[in-house]
Regions:
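N-terminal small-domain helix-loop-helix segment of the aminotransferase-like
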Residues: 2-103, 110, 277, 289-292, ...
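Helix C-cap/helix->beta junction micro-motif
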Residues: 31, 139, 199-200, 230, ...
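Conserved core segment of the aminotransferase class I/II
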Residues: 55, 225-304, 314-315, 399-400
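Conserved PLP-anchoring active-site segment centered on the Schiff-base-forming lysine
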Residues: 114-136
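A short helix-loop-beta submotif of the ANL/AMP-binding
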Residues: 138-144
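Active-site phosphate-binding strand-loop segment of PLP-dependent enzymes
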Residues: 144, 149-220
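PLP-dependent enzyme catalytic core of the Aspartate aminotransferase-like
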Residues: 162-163, 344-350, 354-363, 369-406
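Conserved glycine-rich beta-strand-loop-beta hairpin in the small C-terminal domain of fold type I
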Residues: 287, 303-317, 325-339, 373
Length: 406
């Protein structure tokens, strides 16, 4: 009898933020065990609510959002995004250069499917948000990982990036602010990346979903604004800044010499048309969300929840013998380093699985972010201080006598 297996296209695709360790956590929960999930940046379950005017706007427009929209998105949303690009100093963006999406995730899949032929190479950061590597692979390409240097605040290593460019390289991916490290790249680093793209005729994909979540007075700069002569696809959305991850509301913007990308843009239009349109009720809140008071800023100042939780987890992690971490400047993740020799760790997935089973706290291992060594893991610091303290205490207790057994 015939059996049905997954496509071979998926053989090398993984997304361990929601992978085998999460499956085990879900099994534990189904058996009645309470698990604290610190594996995914989903603000709402931790008590972060969307601004009231955003919710009211969706309710008000819902009756008028029952049909399809233009495949690029509704006019009001794209107009607001165009104005946001002006604030970000991204030049010459017209309405037709903007595409709304069901979150940035859908758009990552779209931009890679539209560009990549079998064997093409895309430079992707290590560590990365793993959907980038997964989508490049699914499209038939090869994700070539350049190192982000922990000793330099997790900034990209430009020379490593340069050394990995070949005649098969088509694009550079940057994630700024970065997930999982929380790094925010300064102008100088972005200008060096732009110079590489310019020198080797590469396009740039810039994932900027956390650009409104910076702390400590750190300014975010869009690489598209610094390199108007380089073809860039800049991605953003409301999931994190407005705490509406479940609404699936993202967008991408094309900038730079678009006449050099006519064929690619034709492909993007085809893919956009094939999915008809993105979520219309979510599109309807973009104008209010971007034009209104940015209430997320209150969370990011001293005394605000995200700021204080970042301060706590940074100190707590660095106080645990065998752990160290660079202080994140944005988003809500920290990416600690663990002394693998001290704990005899050879398999970071087993480490987080052991911790989950013993302490009922779910983390994500570093290799899930395409980090090459088993010496890092990611903590989401969205829970309140009481929950974070409990998680940090459990981690300290667990590591006090942990020795990995394979």
């Amino acid at each position: 009898m015939r059996t049905f297996d997954k496509s071979s296209k998926l053989d090398n695709v993984c997304y361990d933020v929601r992978g085998p360790v999460l499956d085990e956590a879900n099994r534990m929960q189904e058996s009645g065990i309470d698990v604290l999930k610190l594996n995914i940046g989903n603000p709402a379950p931790f008590g972060f609510n969307a601004p009231e005017e955003v919710i009211l706007d969706m309710i008000y427009t819902l009756r008028h959002s029952q049909g399809y929209s233009d495949s690029h998105g509704i006019f009001a949303a794209r107009k607001a995004i165009m104005q946001y690009c002006q604030i970000k100093k991204i030049k010459d963006v017209a309405l037709e250069d903007i595409y709304t999406g069901n979150g940035v995730s859908e758009l990552i899949n779209m931009v890679t499917q539209g560009l990549i032929d079998d064997g093409d190479e895309i430079l992707v950061p290590s560590p990365d948000y793993p959907l980038w590597t997964g989508c490049v692979t699914l499209a038939g390409g090869k994700a070539v990982h350049y190192i982000c240097d922990e000793q330099s605040d997790w900034y990209p290593d430009i020379e490593d990036m340069r050394s990995k460019i070949t005649d098969k390289t088509k694009a550079i991916v940057i994630i700024n602010p970065n997930n999982p490290t929380g790094a925010v790249y300064p102008k100088e680093v972005l200008e060096e990346i732009a110079a590489l793209a310019r020198e080797h005729d590469l396009m740039i994909f810039s994932d900027e979903i956390y650009d409104r979540l910076t702390m400590d007075g750190v300014a975010h700069h869009s690489i598209a604004a610094l390199a108007p002569d380089v073809f860039c696809v800049t991605m953003n959305g409301l999931s994190k800044s407005h705490m509406v991850a479940g609404f699936r509301c993202g967008w991408m913007v094309l900038s730079g010499p678009k006449e050099r990308a006519k064929g690619y843009i034709e492909g993007l239009n085809m893919l956009s048309n094939m999915r008809l349109c993105s979520n219309v009720p979510a599109q309807s809140i973009v104008q209010t969300a971007l034009g209104g008071f940015q209430s997320v800023q209150e969370y990011l100042q001293p005394g605000g929840r995200i700021y204080e939780q970042r301060e706590y987890i940074y100190k707590a992690v660095n106080d645990i013998p065998g752990l160290s971490a660079v202080k994140p400047k944005a988003a809500f993740y920290i990416f600690p380093k663990i002394d693998t020799k001290r704990f005899h760790i050879l398999d970071d997935e087993k480490f987080v699985l052991d911790f989950l089973k013993e302490k009922k706290v779910l983390l994500t291992h570093g290799k899930g972010f395409n980090w090459g060594e088993p010496d890092h893991f990611r903590i989401v610091y969205l829970p309140n201080l009481e929950q974070l303290k409990s998680a940090a205490d459990k981690l300290a207790d667990f590591l006090s006598d942990y020795q990995q057994k394979l």
